[in-house]
């Protein structure tokens, strides 16, 4: 599996998290988060983190938010990041996400995405 494949799969997973949070299906949400954790492990094991730091940040932050058990915040974060993998597919740039990022930070604080 290469980084492009991982990015496509993670994009699907982020969309699932957004959807399953919205419909409040805890079992399917857990499955989607488990898939993301598997891809995170693969990225770490294959030492791909330096190639996709924004993606690694999004994964780690998503799990931090999931631990807070704030469904609205998790939905909003997944909504903001679901297309982030497109950066590594050459479809978008980080700057093209400023509206999504700014909207999320306006609601939940500007500590998010500062490291990027």
Task: Identify what each model region corresponds to.
Residues 1-40, 105:
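Short terminal alpha-helical segments
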Residues 26-34, 53-57, 75, 79, ...:
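Short, charged, amphipathic alpha-helical segments
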Residues 41-65:
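Short, solvent-exposed, charged loop/turn and helix-capping segments
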Residues 70-116:
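Amphipathic alpha-helical binding modules
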Residues 23-27, 50, 69-73, 92:
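Short helix-adjacent coil turns
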């Amino acid at each position: 599996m290469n980084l492009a494949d991982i990015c496509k799969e993670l994009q699907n997973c982020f969309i699932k998290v957004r959807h399953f949070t919205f419909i409040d299906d805890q079992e399917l949400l857990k499955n989607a988060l488990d898939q993301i954790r598997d891809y995170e492990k693969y990225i770490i094991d294959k030492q791909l983190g330096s190639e996709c730091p924004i993606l690694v940040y999004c994964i780690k932050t998503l799990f931090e938010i999931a631990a807070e058990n704030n469904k609205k915040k998790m939905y909003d974060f997944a909504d903001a990041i679901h297309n982030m993998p497109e950066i590594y597919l050459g479809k978008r740039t980080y700057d093209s996400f400023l509206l999504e990022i700014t909207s999320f930070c306006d609601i939940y604080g500007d500590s998010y995405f500062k490291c990027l």
